[in-house]
């Protein structure tokens, strides 16, 4: 697999990665940004940096509504950027305002994976506040189903199940080159 930088079409201002937790947004985003010669921006990392505490701590201290408000502020900020690959948090697309801003900001790519794959990928992770009390496949499936209508709003959808990060990046760059 070639690792050289490719040129994104000039019509591609940003690439926005959406998807449920554990679908590969961060891993794919970092490599995709490198391949495109874009900057990489992780919304959750921006929030943590701005607040000075972890996502878990934000949820524990202030609750999900406060976190979602911070997330919308971060979306507003990155939507003004150019030549950036943005990895959103899994729930960022729940907000109609966020979906609108993200669509205007660039090409929205939704990464998916099977429930089983997400469970496998998240098995050892402890920084997922919405799964802290229930990490079951049933809980994950229910959350994925609740969000499906919002994820489906993407320009491109890629199932990452069983694929390497490189393969997913190649699918995205192939799409962008043909756009």
Swiss-Prot record:
Substrate binds at residues 44, 68, 90, 147. GO terms for biological process: amino acid biosynthetic process; aromatic amino acid family biosynthetic process; chorismate biosynthetic process. PROSITE patterns: SHIKIMATE_KINASE. Pfam families: SKI (PF01202). ATP binds at residues 22-27, 128. Its main location: cytoplasm. InterPro entries: P-loop_NTPase, Shikimate/glucono_kinase, Shikimate_kinase/TSH1, Shikimate_kinase_CS. Its EC number is 2.7.1.71. Mg(2+) binds at residue 26. Binds 1 Mg(2+) ion per subunit. The keyword Magnesium applies. Pathway: Metabolic intermediate biosynthesis; chorismate biosynthesis; chorismate from D-erythrose 4-phosphate and phosphoenolpyruvate: step 5/7. Its cofactor is Mg(2+). One of its GO terms (molecular function) is shikimate kinase activity. It comes from the Bacteria. The keyword Cell cycle does not apply. Keywords: Amino-acid biosynthesis, Aromatic amino acid biosynthesis, ATP-binding, Cytoplasm, Kinase, Magnesium, Metal-binding, Nucleotide-binding, Transferase. CDD domains: SK (cd00464). It is found in: Cytoplasm. GO terms for cellular component: cytosol. It catalyses: shikimate + ATP = 3-phosphoshikimate + ADP + H(+). Coiled coil: none annotated. Monomer. Catalyzes the specific phosphorylation of the 3-hydroxyl group of shikimic acid using ATP as a cosubstrate. Belongs to the shikimate kinase family. This is Shikimate kinase. It comes from Geobacter metallireducens (strain ATCC 53774 / DSM 7210 / GS-15). The lineage of its organism: Bacteria, Pseudomonadati, Thermodesulfobacteriota, Desulfuromonadia, Geobacterales.
């Amino acid at each position: 697999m070639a690792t050289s930088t490719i040129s994104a079409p000039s019509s591609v201002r940003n690439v926005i990665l959406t998807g449920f937790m554990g679908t590969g947004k961060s891993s794919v985003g970092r490599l995709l940004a490198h391949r495109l010669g874009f900057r990489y921006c992780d919304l959750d990392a921006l929030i943590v940096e701005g607040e000075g505490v972890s996502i878990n701590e934000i949820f524990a201290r202030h609750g999900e509504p406060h976190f979602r408000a911070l997330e919308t502020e971060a979306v507003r900020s990155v939507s003004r950027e150019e030549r950036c690959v943005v990895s959103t948090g899994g729930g960022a697309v729940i907000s109609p305002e966020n979906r609108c801003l993200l669509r205007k900001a660039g090409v929205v790519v939704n990464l998916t994976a099977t429930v089983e794959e997400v469970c496998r990928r998240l098995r050892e992770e402890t920084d997922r506040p919405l799964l802290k009390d229930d990490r079951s496949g049933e809980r994950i499936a229910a959350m994925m189903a609740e969000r499906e209508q919002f994820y489906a709003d993407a320009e491109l959808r890629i199932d990452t199940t069983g694929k390497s990060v490189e393969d997913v990046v190649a699918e995205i760059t192939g799409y962008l080159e043909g756009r």
